[in-house]
């Protein structure tokens, strides 16, 4: 008698787990590339402008890899000088398959996560970035700011 009750209880538990639905999320992969380029910007007092472009080669990724987000990390090679302070405003990014750049506000600690405009884009290919900055100084003369060897991490899934 005890065996049948135990077996019935066990059967009910197994049935409960077999009828519940579970959600599985696709694992996201990522690749980080360091650019050999420097994003540099020189500005006169109280002016804004765009830096030079840094490029990243992601040609080794599978052709069916699509972007879920990208992260720009410009923290490692920051140098600046001159008569003022240049504030980084926005980072602009595109890859080979995009007609135009998309942008996002510059992130804290020089790291910027971008999803808008890049989700669903092919991950493979050449990516390009630059930043927009403003010299907030009231001192006469110009200032410069450089981000050497920025890093770009592309997070992707497969179609």
Where does each model-flagged region fall?
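Bacterial Sec-dependent N-terminal signal peptides
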Residues: 1-13
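Sec-dependent signal peptide cleavage junction
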Residues: 6-8, 17-32
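Solvent-exposed, flexible loop/coil segments flanking beta-strands in beta-rich domains
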Residues: 26-59
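A eukaryote-biased signal for long
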Residues: 49-51, 64-65, 109
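A general structural motif
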Residues: 64-67, 124-126
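A short beta-strand element within beta-rich, extracytoplasmic domains
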Residues: 65-79
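Beta-strand acidic-aromatic groove motif in beta-rich domains, primarily in extracellular
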Residues: 80-93
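Cysteine-clustered segments with highest specificity for TGF-beta superfamily mature ligands
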Residues: 93-159
């Amino acid at each position: 008698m005890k065996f049948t009750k135990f077996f019935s209880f066990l059967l009910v538990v197994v049935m409960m787990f077999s009828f519940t639905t579970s959600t599985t999320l696709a694992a996201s992969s990522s690749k980080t590339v360091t650019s050999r380029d420097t994003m540099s910007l020189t500005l006169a007092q109280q002016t804004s402008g765009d830096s030079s472009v840094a490029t990243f080669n992601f040609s080794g990724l599978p052709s069916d890899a699509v972007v879920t987000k990208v992260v720009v990390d410009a923290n490692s090679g920051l140098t600046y000088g001159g008569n003022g302070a240049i504030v980084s405003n926005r980072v602009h990014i595109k890859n080979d398959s995009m007609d135009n750049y998309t942008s996002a506000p510059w992130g804290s600690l020089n790291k910027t996560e971008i999803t808008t405009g890049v989700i669903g884009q092919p991950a493979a290919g050449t990516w390009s970035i630059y930043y927009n900055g403003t010299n907030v100084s009231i001192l006469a003369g110009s200032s410069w700011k450089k981000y050497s060897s920025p890093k770009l991490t592309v997070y992707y899934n497969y179609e």
